[in-house]
Amino acid sequence: MILIDGKKIAAELRQELKKEVSDLKAKYNKVPGLTVILIGDMTPSQIYVRNKEKSAIEVGLKSDVIKYPDTVEEKVILDKIHDLNKDDAVSGILVQLPLPKHIDKKKVIEKIDPSKDVDGFHPMNVGNLSSGYESSVPCTPLGCYLLIKKMEPNLNGKKAVIIGRSNLNGKPMAQLLLKENCTVTITHSRTKDLKAECLEADIIVAAVGIPELVKGDWVKKDTIVIDVGINKTDKGLSLIHI
């Protein structure tokens, strides 16, 4: 078994992005800017945003985090997004999810200019990805895709099994692999004999948040296995158990 070193690959990618940002600055005398809207004080969201800000600064982007209490009115958020859409200094907008219950996630996502939609959640970007057109792609499936391509550049004809059908991970992951001419099967909680599906796969991406879901005897030799997310168990932090 070969362990995929995601941290190493991510570091290499950040170096590539750093050069791209430097080239953009030299050519246009302008640095792309990322603005993140963070609502509330949920610890996981704060960690995610802090890591995003750190990575943005590392590659040379301008980074701005706008924080609101979880009591903020929905209109305040929508008005701020409206202003950011019109701000030429802002290249990308990201609203950290989840949102407080009184704020309509759909309204917030649809308010973001599709060309500045970093998460790729806007219906226009979702539709473009499904249609094979250029679009913003959700970051997590895009990261998984880049890891897979690093391990196997030629995915033509590979059989891929996606465990999970969420709009955030499963569905966009399937679209990315379909564009590479993979034969893609999306599985979920109602799938019969998940083990049999996995045993036929050249690529398995688990995106359901269940620790140790994919067992060692579910995976054939040389299969690429990616687990989306980290789960906390009695044994500590856990990835897929293989």
Where are the regions that the model predicts?
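Short beta-strand elements in bilobed, periplasmic/extracellular small-molecule ligand-binding domains
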Residues: 34, 56-70, 184-185
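Positively charged, low-complexity intrinsically disordered leader regions
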Residues: 1-28
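Anion-binding alpha/beta catalytic cores of soluble intermediary-metabolism enzymes, centered on
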Residues: 95-156, 173
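Short, well-structured alpha-helical segments in soluble
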Residues: 76-88
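Glycine-rich phosphate/diphosphate-binding loop of Rossmann-like nucleotide-binding domains
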Residues: 44-53, 138-214, 218, 224
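Short beta->alpha junction loops
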Residues: 40, 64-74, 189-190
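Conserved small/polar residues in nucleotide/adenosyl-binding loops
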Residues: 240-242
